[in-house]
């Protein structure tokens, strides 16, 4: 598996992965940037990919790809300067398509992105996941994550689409 810059060339594979998620939100894929776009349309998809690669956005997006197949996404947010990022989402978000899970892809991607975080001057990063996501908790801990707390559901979290308790882990990026 390699982390690559998002590309419109993977449209068909991305659509297949999206279907595995039921056409819903994909963690780490920054689909929120596509509001108003039809990602099944190649032109709209290419527009969204350009947004992902826009240097003016304070985030770095990578796609997990193997043999030309889209397997998932991981996003490194350079700052967590909003209450939602600081409390619920953190510096790094990721997701692996259901058919590719259990192969260590998330762990590999997170380790690589931790190096990127260190290179841009982040000495530690916040990584959050749902309390009921045992696989993600295992990935985060395997990469050095230390649980700070579990944020319980309230009006603020619900207003940001988070309806389950959120585990908040810090990971030191220094080697």
Residue ranges with predicted function:
Residues 1-91, 95-98, 116, 153, ...:
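GNAT-family acyltransferases
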Residues 68, 104, 121, 133:
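Conserved G/P- and acidic residue-centered "switch" motifs that form tight phosphate/ATP-binding loops
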Residues 93-96, 102-119, 137-142:
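Conserved acetyl-CoA-binding loop-helix of GNAT-fold acetyltransferases
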Residues 112, 129, 152-153:
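Proline- and acidic/polar-enriched loop/turn elements at helix boundaries
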Residues 117-128:
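Conserved GNAT acetyl-CoA-binding A-motif
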Residues 118, 135, 157-159:
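Short secondary-structure boundary/hinge segments and terminal tails
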Residues 127-137:
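Conserved beta-strand-loop-alpha-helix junction that forms the acyl-donor binding cleft
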Residues 141-151:
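Conserved acetyl-CoA-binding loop of GNAT-fold acetyltransferases
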